[in-house]
């Protein structure tokens, strides 16, 4: 299981730990942090809400959270550079925003963090499985992702990547028996952390989610992420072009290279429209002012045409 995910992000299995969700994985990571003079966590409002919630929870332990506001649904490395400095403990970036599919330049954002001797954390939930990831080339320190979205799995399984050079420097407080060298040691009077990223593990895994997700990971690896990326770019391009032709406005990037596997259209009553479309067998997701479609490699141009035309029809009523 760990080796499959590690292969997907170009890491080693020893740098990967399974968790229950990105929320729990990120929380486990931050539970290893101490906040002294370097107490600032930099994050943006383009992240999925859980990241903002988890870092705000660190304020009771001395963290100071700095939130970057997006400009027209995007944030750039310069936005991070303006607010990082000698007090920065961690820079948090979302690889692909669930709001509109914007792809952040995680390599450049990581350089911003490293230039001030800080570290970079990446939420890759919306990119893993559809956008190629190489944690070594991108110089990523920490990364999380889950299997529910583009990895074709179930809720209940996520992964935390920790760069091997950092593992032994961190002693998390949010742990369980799987975090120890000997998980079966009864009556322990001191902690004996695993030497690998397993030290960030907690308790018993969600076994049904695990087995389903193993199959999903194998499918993605067999299909190949570069191939998936190429197909999805064509489908999202089709969605944007057709939507504009039908009078829809999108908050997703027009540049194919800046867009992940989703397109968000601005519609009236997004949540209500989501429910109406679901009843018709068209699965979308309302996020803020937008209604999001998120094709995968198994979708077809006909699927896109049907969905976008129906969205335009309902929005015109």
Q: For each of these PLM feature ranges, what is it?
A:
Residues 1-317:
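Pyridoxal 5′-phosphate
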């Amino acid at each position: 299981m760990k080796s499959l995910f590690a292969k997907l992000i170009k890491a080693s299995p020893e740098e990967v730990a399974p968790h229950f969700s990105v929320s729990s994985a990120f929380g486990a990571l931050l539970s290893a942090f101490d906040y002294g003079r370097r107490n600032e966590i930099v994050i943006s409002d383009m992240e999925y809400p859980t990241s903002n919630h988890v870092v705000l929870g660190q304020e009771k332990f001395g963290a100071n959270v700095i939130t970057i506001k997006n400009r027209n649904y995007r944030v750039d490395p310069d936005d991070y550079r303006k607010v990082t400095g000698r007090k920065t403990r961690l820079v948090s970036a979302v690889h692909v925003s669930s709001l509109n599919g914007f792809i952040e330049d995680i390599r450049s954002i990581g350089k911003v963090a490293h230039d001030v001797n800080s570290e970079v954390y990446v939420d890759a939930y919306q990119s893993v499985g559809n956008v190629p990831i190489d944690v070594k080339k991108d110089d990523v320190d920490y990364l999380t992702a889950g299997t529910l979205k583009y990895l074709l799995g179930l809720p209940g399984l996520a992964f935390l990547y920790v760069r091997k050079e950092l593992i032994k420097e961190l002693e998390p407080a949010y742990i369980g028996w799987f975090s120890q060298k000997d998980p079966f040691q009864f009556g322990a009077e001191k902690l004996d952390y695993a030497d690998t990223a397993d030290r960030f593990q907690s308790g018993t895994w969600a076994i049904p989610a695990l087995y389903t997700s193993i199959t999903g990971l194998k499918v993605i690896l067999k299909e190949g992420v570069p191939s998936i990326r190429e197909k999805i770019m064509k489908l999202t391009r089709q969605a944007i072009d057709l939507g504009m032709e039908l009078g829809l406005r999108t908050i997703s990037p027009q540049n194919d290279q800046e867009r992940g596997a989703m397109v968000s259209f601005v519609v009236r009553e997004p949540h209500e429209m989501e429910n109406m479309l679901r009843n018709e067998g068209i699965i979308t997701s309302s996020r803020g002012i937008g209604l999001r479609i998120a094709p995968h490699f198994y979708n077809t141009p006909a699927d896109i045409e049907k969905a976008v035309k129906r969205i335009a029809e309902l929005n015109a009523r």
